[in-house]
UniProtKB/Swiss-Prot annotation:
GO terms for biological process: negative regulation of L-ascorbic acid biosynthetic process. This is Putative F-box protein At1g65770. It comes from the Eukaryota. It comes from Arabidopsis thaliana. Residues 2-50 form the F-box domain. Pfam families: Beta-prop_KIB1-4.
Length: 360
């Protein structure tokens, strides 16, 4: 067996330079003493230092050290694939964010940002292999640590032409906004957008009638690709195997849901999905009948794809989503799928098993 502790420092530096996140770096440095000493941990030279808090302060005259400010900040969450080190072939999907005051990780419901119910207060990470697979953002109020009102249904952190961070967000009304140092400003007045995604370092937005736009580094919008048919439901962008897809949620008639406090809200039940992909040869969007061995995860703040066999219970050719806070799955089955409705916690051995880690 090879002695991994004798690998040359130059090679270890090359490996470390290809790691994705701070968690992977910690795992790398825990292998042995020579690996730990080859790459810095905490400090200025750490390639994955804690991200600085991005503050969105509407009153620039107030000092940013004033914790009573009525400002906003960009809240980052991340999705992880977690496997037992002794059994790495399959794992669970978890989501977490970081408390801006304590720096501690909070586990969240994977398809929303609601706190996840669990009995364990601490988890020994040395027993697991953890890989970050996706990040997502929301704009939160500094005082409440909750979403701002009106809310942003989608938020993206992008690079402008100077290489600096720029925050783009889509309001619940569909209006595209960007943060201009002092205030939020609207982009592309008269248009309504449904999603935004960073794909291969480029930013794309999807409007409410199914047109995809490329957003340049100077925040100019350029139409990219043809219209995706008639609008019939909510549409999202999903990256899969280096390409992006458009997922359309089909909804039925709205019904009125009553809460325990006698208030109510309008709720449209999901009845199906359609998936589209741009066909270069035909120059148009084509409906996709099968996702193969992939599954799409449609969270409230981002979307992404996974290899089904890498997660416990995950179905191939399926779309996981929430409907009125309930996790469901939709099998495409050549375009003739059916939705499975359930609460996930009684079903730890079912197709929702990947959302219920056995160690929590």
């Amino acid at each position: 067996m090879a002695d991994w502790s004798t690998l040359p420092v130059d090679l270890l530096n090359m490996i470390a330079g290809r790691l994705f996140s701070n968690i992977e770096l910690k795992r790398f440095r825990s292998i042995c003493r020579s690996w730990r000493s080859s790459v810095p941990g905490a400090g200025k030279k750490n390639p994955f230092r804690t991200r600085p808090l991005i503050l969105l302060n509407p009153n620039p005259n107030k000092p940013l050290t004033d914790h009573r400010r009525r400002g906003e900040f960009l809240s980052r969450s991340a999705f992880f694939r977690v496997t037992l080190s002794s059994s790495p072939s399959q794992g669970w999907l978890i989501k977490s964010d970081v408390d801006v005051s304590s720096g501690k990780l909070h586990l969240l419901d994977p398809l929303s940002r609601l706190p996840m119910e669990h009995s364990r207060k601490r988890v020994d990470l040395s027993e697991f292999t953890i890989t970050e697979i996706r990040e997502a953002y929301q704009v939160h109020d500094w005082r409440t640590r909750k979403e701002t009102r009106p809310i942003f249904k989608r938020v993206a952190l992008v690079k402008d032409k100077e290489g600096d961070n720029q925050v783009l967000g889509i309001r619940s009304t569909g209006k595209m906004m960007y943060w201009d140092i002092k205030t939020w400003k609207a982009k592309e007045e008269g248009y309504e957008f449904s999603d935004i995604i960073v794909h291969k370092g480029q930013t794309y937005a999807l409007d409410s009638i199914g047109i995809v736009y490329w957003i340049r580094s100077d925040l100019k919008f350029i139409r990219f690709g043809p219209l995706v048919g008639d609008w019939t439901g909510d549409r999202r962008l999903v990256e899969c195997c280096g390409e992006f897809y458009i997922v359309e949620r089909l909804v039925g008639e709205s019904t009125w849901k009553r809460k325990a406090d006698d208030t109510g809200y309008e709720y449209a039940k999901t009845v199906g999905f359609k998936v589209y992909k741009f066909d270069d040869e035909q120059g148009k969007m084509m409906e996709v009948k099968s996702l193969g061995d992939k599954a799409f995860v449609i969270a409230t703040d981002t979307c992404f794809s996974v290899l089904a066999h890498e997660f416990y219970g995950c179905l191939e050719n399926a779309i996981y989503f929430t409907d009125d806070t309930m996790i469901k799955v939709f099998k495409l089955d050549n375009g003739n799928g059916s939705s499975i409705e359930t609460t996930i916690y009684p079903y730890a051995q079912s197709c929702f098993q990947m959302f219920v880690p056995s160690f929590l």
